[in-house]
């Protein structure tokens, strides 16, 4: 099956965040950005994406307004709150950013 190629416009790029894991003591870093699907529709979809570890460099050189082709995985995690309610959290982990300008 051929991979679907969708182009996005970069809307916002947040700064790199970093720290040390309390659980493992390892250093971590991440960076988020917002991209909007380039489509001929009235309300295009936007997605919040996260780059982690050395992948934070993938967005270096990309500016707000640039057109990019992205590779990312979307993952939902379910968890129980203290009162027993099931909640869900979604992560969109980006692993490819290709500048198309």
What positions do the PLM features span?
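Single-stranded nucleic acid-binding surfaces, predominantly the OB-fold ssDNA-binding core
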Residues: 1-101
């Amino acid at each position: 099956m051929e991979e679907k190629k969708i182009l996005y416009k970069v809307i916002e790029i947040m700064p790199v965040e970093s720290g040390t894991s309390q659980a493992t003591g390892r250093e971590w870093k991440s960076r988020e950005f917002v991209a909007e699907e380039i489509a001929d529709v009235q309300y295009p979809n936007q997605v919040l994406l996260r780059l982690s570890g050395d992948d934070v460099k993938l967005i270096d050189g990309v500016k707000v307004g640039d057109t990019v082709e992205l590779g990312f995985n979307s993952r939902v995690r379910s968890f129980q709150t203290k009162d027993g309610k099931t909640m869900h959290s979604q992560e969109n982990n980006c692993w490819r950013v290709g500048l198309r300008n």
